[in-house]
C-alpha cells in the first residue's frame, strides 16, 4: 500500500498571470515553477497548479482550511476589491468561512476553520 502525501488542485485559468497574482499577492503563495503556460504556487507544503483553461470548463470548488479565518480575512480584505466575495460567516456544519471567486477562473475558493 502507498502513503498519500497530499493532493494538489489543478485550476484552469483564462489568464495565468492574473490568477497567479491572486495566489501570490493575496494568499501569499510563492511561485515555484513557471513554464510559460503552466505554473505551480506553494505555501506551507501545499501546492496549486495553474494551467490554461479549455473552452468548456465547468465550475470548480476547493476548500482551504486555516487556523484563524478572521485573521485571514483581516489580512486580505483590502486586497480583494472587485472580486466576488462572501465575508466571514458561520455555517450550520460547524465551520466559519470566507468564499472568494478566484480571478479569471470558474473556481470558488472556500477558506474556513472549525468553530466550537
Could you say what each language-model-derived stretch is?
Residues 24-25, 42, 77:
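Alpha-helical segments within the soluble intracellular
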Residues 15-30:
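Amphipathic alpha-helical segments
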Residues 16, 63-108, 115:
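Vicinal oxygen chelate
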Residues 28-34, 82-87:
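Short secondary-structure junctions
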Residues 1-18, 60-62, 115-116:
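N-terminal beta-strand motif that seeds the catalytic metal site of vicinal oxygen chelate
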Residues 30-64, 107-113:
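Conserved short beta-strand elements that form part of the metal-binding/catalytic scaffold
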